[in-house]
Amino acid sequence: MINNDGHRLAFHVTPGHLPAIVLDAGGGLDSSYWKDLVPKIAAATGSEIITYDRAGLGDSDEVPGPWKVESAVGDLETGLRALRVTRNVILVSHSQAGEVAAYFTRGNRQLVSGAVLVDASLPELYTDEEIARLVAANKPQVDAAKADPSTKENRQLIATAENYAPMHQAYHQVSWPDSVPATVIVSEKTPFDGSPEDAQLWRDAAAAFAKAGPDRTLITAVGSSHDIPIERPDLVLSEIEKMATARG
């Protein structure tokens, strides 16, 4: 456990060499999401593998109030410092963790040597129109959570929803550093499998992100849902291995 700003964070390390590979799961998910992939990545790359639970998830302490990406970035920075990881980090970020990756990479360009963004939440998606659509679509689920805040899952959902619109308006303006290569894996079905319009916007955002800078590659996980690491671990492993070889 690593302490930061009054709360404890659970980090898990598989020893190895650089580049260090940091796996970050999506919203509401903890480090166990990667349990089947970790030994495969370690065997394929020989790299140090780091997984962790963001605040309020898994074994990490909850933090009261709205979820703030800046706080999540600070937690990851503190964790890596405590683990003495000071260079050559590859981020593997799924879904909401893409937001953490974008801000973290902007603030730590000398630390991050590459990223594999797995159906990640990317800035290009969040126009004012799409933010309004997503807030409206999520309202019934958020209202249900507010009616029963006794579970950790519901409290995390409420925390994420509280600051959603202004946070994503700011995120829409964030750009990925040109100096950091990124592989973008987008699912065919996306998180919005029941909404063709939102699903297309998600895929379009991934394509726009990939075109917006050098050393970016777009790959579609054909037939996959949002859970690419679960349904297509072979693809995720292959792209991590390629990035690790290139940055090793």
How would you describe each model-predicted region?
Residues 144-224:
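Conserved serine/cysteine hydrolase catalytic core
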Residues 214-248:
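Catalytic active-site module of serine/aspartate enzymes centered on a nucleophile-bearing elbow/loop
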Residues 53, 118-119, 185:
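Alpha/beta-hydrolase-fold catalytic nucleophile elbow
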Residues 115-150, 157, 204:
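Flexible "cap/lid" loop of the alpha/beta hydrolase fold
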Residues 34-35, 60-66, 127-128:
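Conserved catalytic-core motifs of eukaryotic protein kinase domains, centered on the activation segment
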Residues 87-124:
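Conserved hydrolase catalytic core segment
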Residues 5-59:
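Conserved HGGG/HGGXW glycine-rich cap/lid loop of the alpha/beta-hydrolase fold
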Residues 45-92, 135:
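Active-site loop/oxyanion-hole signature of alpha/beta-hydrolase fold enzymes
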